[in-house]
Amino acid sequence: MLNGQWELAEAGNDRLCEVQVPGSVLSGLYGAGKIEDPFYRTNEDVTRELFRKDYEFSRTFVAAEDILKEEKIILVCEGLDTLADIYINGQKAGSADNMHRIWKLDVKEFLHSGENQIRIVFRSVFKYIEAYEYEDNKEIHYVPCGGMKGNQLIRKAHCMFGWDWGPQTIDAGIFRDIYLEAYSHPRIEDVKITQVQGDNAVDVCTTVAVSGDAVDKCQLRVTIQEDAESVCGHRTGANDRKTEAHVCKVGETVSANNNPAVLTSSIHNPKLWWPNGYGDQSLYKVQVELLDEDGTVLETITKRIGLRTLTISQEKDLWGKEFAFCVNGVKIFAMGGNYIPEDCIYSRITPEVQKYLLESCKRANFNCVRVWGGGYYPSDHFYDLCDEMGLIVWQDLMFACNVYDLTEEFEENITKEITENVKRLRHHASLGLWCGNNEMESAWDHWPEVQSESKYLRADYIKMFEYVIPKAVRAADSETFFWQSSPSSGGCFDDSDDENRGDCHYWDVWHGQKPFTDYQKHYFRFCSEFGFQSFPCLKTVESFTEEKDRNIFSRVMENHQKNPAANGKILYYLSENFRYPENFRKLLYVSQILQGMAMKYGVDHWRRHRGRCMGTLYWQINDNWPVASWASIDYFGRWKALHYMAKKFYGPQAVSMCMDGDIMQVYLANESMDAQSYQVAFYVKNMECEILEKLTGTGTVGVQESAPILAVDVSGWEDKKYEIFLEAEVTLADGGVLCDVETLVPYKYLELDKPEITAEVEEQGDAFVIHLKSSCFSPFTAIGFTDADVTLEDNFFHMTDGEEMCVRLDKKDIRNGEIMDAADLTQQMEILTLA
């Protein structure tokens, strides 16, 4: 490994500081105290200008004799950001120009015994963009919202140039592992695993390509067994059943050039992999060993797979063509969100950060995440976690909201990028879909600023996304469904936003400032983007502001709001629904309630129409810096109201209400593989939580069905509409209780009383239990903590009666701080209410 301590300098100048690799210019300078926190106040402006210079990373290392004697010595750079020249002992060994690729250089000729020096010079992307020479009639003028001109010319995460939720941090460096590989024997070049499903058996076909001399004297051994270990610890349910090992000589059963070899293993009584909520996430370990003629193991490659079928169903139906993930023959309703890079400084993206975010998704009952195309391809660890958690990955290729100049060099570069990443990820059980790009087909169809670009650039789009990229993906992975763009109806500019087929992005609520009720006018087959902004909590705002900055229209707050019209939109929707908050903290809190309400309104509607709509992925799950945004989890991992609400509206069973004239309809959505018997109670209550009317019913909702379970005429309450609220309570056969609350007027018109809430904390072994009581109706009650960060079992909940309510806090869910005991928790606890 060449990770560890390196020297950082401006190119050609004296040392600036030490930098830990994986690391970057920003992580090094900030860690050494050479710059302030790039995220604090308006430091983004200073940070951006640093990258008009070139930088170099250097270190020395010892090349041992046992390494030097090998025939091949390969320098492996898993992540170079981005325009890099690599020097060994003063001699140029190679260059890199794509942060999405792994770079491998044969450096044997440059090494000598003893101490060696490696130096990597990162060239300024600004200089590259300024010097770029377009072909005739192909200059690109389009710039994404919040971005920078020329960002699309470089294979670097687009959002590093800025987005409408992210800063222009740019950065450069060695953001993943760097190391030497030395060998003299043949090597495994590629392993591809495919499956053929049969009656109570699965044939696993392992195709292995081997390179090097004396290949014909080598053997391959493939062993498959249930995997009992996870990347997080022991996996339950696996009993380590091994299949028989398969051994053959390379070339015995293969093509004329004796490569690759295909080995087939049959697994009887297989344990299938299912998405979260549908069954177990059973996984199998496939171990491929390359042996010499004496049986000595030369190399071992291990991959983990799930036995399943997974594709997109596009059957024709009453409304057009469905768009639904189909797993093991079962069509599922996708529930999840869009995932962006976890940090602006990519070397700070750790397995722990990824695990926390994905666990938060699973806890909120997600079964799907979309890796958005304006960022980067996450590490193998990310997909291992998705495999274990049952999170289907909609995987965008890294092209988003842009116009590209498809030169020969660019085509070659992206083809290698795609081939490499598809081969790296194709075996994962969670991989559900390859998508060519984000919003680019729709942009050429509908965005005037893109349509005004050269017709030659439009032709480049067609060649790139209708031919070059699909060809590269299918050559490396013929098993996984490919989708040209998102949104799309199937490509070729065939009405890319058609609601009756393909996937849609819906932004009239928010960007179009239409009311939440507008969601009910649309019946998308699959809504892969829709969203609503909110501010982060006060604790997060305090991390990047001084006290004088804490006004949403201050220079600092607007710098941490990258959508120019967003603050006005938040206030517009607030004025439609709530009274103006009395202070800054309350404004942040109410903005989060608005966000959660908006997303709930859309998801509830589309779940009520399961079968016509088969998926909702809201925008967005996470942030890459502290900011006002569409995220449901902020940069520090703090759940906003939306994420707590998603845990309910994405539940395997979810209750919702909607008005149909004078009738309030109560629906129960059941996404589980079992029918659900229920008892339903509908209440009309006053502000003191007294029951004014009650209706009940019983019944059963079928497997993967959404159905109305009660209809109530509420026209008789018109004269009391400012003094009442409506509550639907569903009790399931297993004792689970689901609730939903609605009002007949916006909350701003309700005659809410100021609640008196008492809270007592009890310590119960590995958890604390908070016992709450309210003197009156208290909608969207929120619990916060001054020091520690915590994830509660429930939050932003409605207190609808005088009975005691209990909220659990598991001690393992206490982060970034400490809570010693019940008294300490009580002291740190703060309760926010709407009234």
List each language-model region with its residue ranges.
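Substrate-binding clefts and catalytic carboxylate motifs of secreted carbohydrate-active enzymes
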Residues: 10-11, 170-173, 434, 471-474, ...
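Secreted/periplasmic carbohydrate-active enzymes, especially glycoside hydrolases
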Residues: 1-368, 500, 608-609, 613, ...
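Active-site neighborhood of glycoside hydrolase catalytic domains
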Residues: 388, 405-493, 636
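The substrate-binding groove and active-site-proximal loops of carbohydrate-active enzymes
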Residues: 99, 164-167, 274-275, 338-350, ...
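Loop/turn elements at helix/coil->beta-strand transitions in domains of secreted/extracellular proteins
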Residues: 332, 362-369, 387-394, 427-433, ...
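Hydrophobic faces of well-ordered beta-strands that scaffold small-molecule active sites
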Residues: 335-337, 369-371, 393-395, 436, ...
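Aromatic-lined substrate-binding rim segments of carbohydrate-active enzymes
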Residues: 368-412, 496-513
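Alpha-helical scaffolding within the catalytic cores
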Residues: 317-323, 379-381, 416-424
